[in-house]
Amino acid sequence: MEAIKMQLPCNFLPQEDGRCGWYEMLPEPPVATPLRGEVKADWVVLGAGFAGLAAARRLGELQPEKKIALIDARRVGFGAAGRNSGFMIDLPHDLSSHSYTGAQDSDLRQIRLNRGAIDYMRDIVKRYAIECDWQERGKFHGAVEPHGIRALEAFAKGLSQLGEPYEELDAHAMKRITGTDFYRAGLHAPGAVQVQPAALVRGLGATLPSNVTLYEDSPVRNIIIGNPHTLVTDLGHLQAPKIVLANNAYAAQFSQLGLKGRILPMYTYGSLTRPLTASEQQTLGGEESWGLLPADPMGSTVRRLANGRICIRNSFTYNPNVRASAQQLKLVLAAHQRSFNKRFPMLPKVAMEYTWGGALCVSRNGGAPFGEINPGVFSAVCQNGLGLTRGTISGKLIAEYALGIKSDLLDYALLQPKPTANPPEPLLSIGVRSTLAWKEWQAGIEL
């Protein structure tokens, strides 16, 4: 069946969205190679985040004689893939759930997929000696008030039912680890990996197979679906008979492919403090480096880094134009400083040095449009808030799916439900924003 010719205008492209500390701490990258002139390839992958990098790498590995083009509007590591909190999470992590877990069969499949992603990434990081502060130290969950403690108990119960190991922690143990007496209860799960996300993404981009060409700073203005498909940029055209969509939240604008109205572009936000002085680190105490997720999914993620900085991540907004406004960033900075001050009152002079927003993509039912959605058009978008793991495994598996390579993990990916339809506007915006406000209010001091 031949692809029906259609045009997909790309009206929403990655913006500045604040100053991302993860990216700003890296050295200057080598000069970018933008797309120029008329270029032809066997495959084109749109978006150089975790899904796109994994898809391009796997296509290059499996078809070394083919020409693979990977294209991104910005520098690798600048976009959403370099703007998260740096957790590769192995366990269920349903942001719409009260306690992250859901139906047991689905959770078990997701664990297999997440660990498949971690295994694949670990091999790449070791093989190419990618410097990204890779730490296999698991993750903590922390709770403050009764609502959060109940969520933590529900998470622990879910892990027990799944046969997953964990350690429950009391307030004294949490203070010994974090240096603060803010948390009343906690839990440690050993399987997660913590990384410097922008460093990891940049390292992945620098170690692609030789038959993969990376085009950066090349915003795609229009996509012509046909035979072949054509991507139009400011400086050229890129043609290929097959395309992998790995642009996550930015794919929500593609109504003709059935994605608009089913996946939602959301934003969450992070801040990094200045480095703590030696005196401040001594005052804080606790372990030198740790990472903590909130018991309530709407609460604050906190990481203490070995370089002396502390990362705060909280606040969700619905941004259908896939950009964060200056006003949103101003409000978020104030919210992050409040969250920091609540947790670390012994550090009254520590301020945020960087604050940024990052796009993520979710669906109402946690589903993803994984597979071939139009002849020669393959989708690896909508990671539902788990970009590092789901993005990585979605990208790897979509390449294998496109080439007819079967596996248990691919079967699990294909069992994911497709995204359900969203209500029409303005009901959608009203509903999403009121739900976010209600859930943040419920999170209370956990935020």
Where do the language-model regions lie?
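Extreme N-terminal leader/targeting segments of oxidoreductases
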Residues: M1-W43, E61-L62, K66-K67
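Glycine-rich Rossmann-fold phosphate-binding loop(s) that bind the pyrophosphate
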Residues: G47-A51, A73
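Internal hydrophobic alpha-helix adjacent to the cofactor/substrate pocket in enzyme cavities
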Residues: G60, S339, G391-D411
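Glycine-rich FAD pyrophosphate-binding loop
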Residues: G60-R83
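Dinucleotide-binding Rossmann-like beta1-alpha1 core, especially the glycine-rich loop
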Residues: L91-A171
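Helical element adjacent to the flavin cofactor pocket in flavoenzyme catalytic cores
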Residues: R150, K157-S160, F182-P241
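Active-site-proximal substrate-binding core of FAD-dependent oxidoreductases
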Residues: V362, N374, Y401-T435
